[in-house]
Curated annotation (Swiss-Prot):
Key words, A-Z: Ribonucleoprotein, Ribosomal protein, RNA-binding, rRNA-binding
NCBIfam families referenced in this protein's UniProt entry, alphabetically: PRK05309.1, uS11_bact
Family: Belongs to the universal ribosomal protein uS11 family.
A molecular-function term among this protein's GO annotations: rRNA binding
Oligomer status and interactors: Part of the 30S ribosomal subunit. Interacts with proteins S7 and S18. Binds to IF-3.
GO cellular component: ribonucleoprotein complex; ribosome
Matching InterPro entries: Ribosomal_uS11, Ribosomal_uS11_bac-type, Ribosomal_uS11_CS, Ribosomal_uS11_sf
UniProt keyword rRNA-binding, yes or no: yes
Role description: Located on the platform of the 30S subunit, it bridges several disparate RNA helices of the 16S rRNA. Forms part of the Shine-Dalgarno cleft in the 70S ribosome.
Gene3D superfamilies recorded: Ribosomal protein S11 (3.30.420.80)
Listed GO biological process terms: translation
Gene name for this UniProt entry: rpsK
Protein name: Small ribosomal subunit protein uS11
HAMAP family the record matches: Ribosomal_uS11
C-alpha cells in the first residue's frame, strides 16, 4: 500500500517592519541571519548555501551574494529597516553590508559585536607555508 504524501505547510508571511541583520564573517565563510528585534530568525543565508565551496566561500563576492539572498527573503516578510551587527575578522564584512543596503533596506545602525579576548584561549600556531 502506498504511503500518503506528507503535506508541508507553506511558510506564513510574517509582517515585520524592523529587523536585525547578524553578519558573521569568519576567515572561512560568511553567514547572514536576519531576525526580528526579539531575535527570532526570519531569513538566513551563507556563502556555502549559495554554492561556493572551499576557499571561494571566504571571498567578498560570496558574502555579497549571501547578503542579497537573505535580504530578498526578509523583504518577502515585510522587513524595511535593519540594524546591522557585524561579527568576526573576515573579508566579507563590508561587502555584505553594502549588499544589504543595495537590496533596499534602510540601515539605522551598524554595530561591531566581535568578541575580544582579554588573554583568554591560546591562539592557533602560525602557519608555515
Amino acid at each position: 500500500m502506498a504511503r500518503d504524501k506528507q503535506r508541508t505547510k507553506k511558510k506564513e508571511r510574517k509582517n515585520i517592519a524592523a529587523g536585525v541583520a547578524h553578519v558573521n564573517s569568519s576567515f572561512n565563510n560568511t553567514k547572514i541571519l536576519i531576525s526580528d528585534v526579539q531575535g527570532n530568525a526570519i531569513a538566513w543565508s551563507s556563502a556555502g548555501t549559495m554554492g561556493f565551496k572551499g576557499s571561494r566561500k571566504s571571498t567578498p563576492y560570496a558574502a555579497q551574494m549571501a547578503a542579497e539572498d537573505a535580504g530578498k527573503k526578509a523583504q518577502e516578510h515585510g522587513v524595511k529597516t535593519l540594524e546591522v551587527q557585524v561579527q568576526g575578522p573576515g573579508s566579507g564584512r563590508e561587502s555584505a553590508l553594502r549588499a544589504l543596503a543595495a537590496v533596499g533596506f534602510n540601515i539605522t545602525a551598524i554595530r561591531d559585536v566581535t568578541p575580544i579576548a582579554h588573554n583568554g584561549c591560546r591562539p592557533p600556531k602560525r602557519r608555515r607555508v
